[in-house]
Amino acid sequence: MPALNRIVADRTRLDDADITWLEDLVDDWQMLADTSFSDLILWVPDRDPNVFWAVAQVRPDTGPTALEDDVVGESVAYDDESLVTEAFMSAEMCETSDNKLSAGIPVDIWAIPVVRRGEVIAVVERHTNQMGVRAPGNTEDNYLEIADILSEMLHHGRFPQFPGSDRALAPKVTDGVIRVAATGMITFASPNALSAFRRLGLAGDLDGEYLIPTVRELCPRLREVGQSLTLDLEGRWLTETDIENSDATCLLYTSDAADDSL
């Protein structure tokens, strides 16, 4: 992340711990981009509190971009109508739903302050291309609910959950998503997640089933390869877990969301 490191070092007052936190956020934020169907921009404050710098940007794999250009390296000056300014000054999430036009495209924008140790250290903007928003459905509704949970976690310093983890080979939202309630019951499984479990031998659906017993039934030898299945799949940590049998191998990436497991 040369742009992030260079701009933060040259232009901001952020300390090493904050810089590391933002680097970990950028490593993990594709999940937020994909579940919100949004482009994300990370803005950091200049030493001059009236200026903000774009240090990272990501586009969604689940929908069309809302931003034609790469804005990394650009700066914005103080504007009392700017969502970045409003979010930074208020430490509260801000949004506009008036379909602001960007290159002729109606775009909804959220600004999420990144709060650590009681202070706002950055702002993440979510830009959603409204022309590309998919028709409402079970998958879309669950993705947006997950995005709202992740946004709240980001706002309150709980996302990323496991700083320093290597996400390079981790599954993506497009590979499949499963939501698990605190009881362990599956409340939603995306089509690709269901397909992955079908390759493991699942005959029915996942909705309404309990994740841990289902995995143990499909992969009875799992304990013999040293997997701490219960702790991992209950989502108490952000971690990766291989589940496998003679038919297939799946990699699960689990995340604990305070009020609703992802």
Which residue ranges define each predicted feature?
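PAS-family sensory domains
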Residues: P45, V51-Y78, N138-A147, F159, ...
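A short beta-strand signature within small-molecule sensing/ligand-binding domains used
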Residues: G104-P113, G235-T241
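Regulatory loop-to-helix N-cap segments in sensory/regulatory domains
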Residues: Q130-E140
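Regulatory input/activation interfaces that engage signals or partners
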Residues: W43-D46, W53-P106, V115
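Short beta-strand-to-loop transition segments that serve as allosteric relay/switch motifs
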Residues: V124-G132, S255
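Short loop/turn elements at sensory-signaling interfaces that couple input to output
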Residues: V114-I121, M131, T241-C250
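Helix-loop-beta substructure at the N-terminus of cytosolic sensory domains
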Residues: W21-F52, A182, L200
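Conserved small/polar residues in nucleotide/adenosyl-binding loops
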Residues: Y253-D260
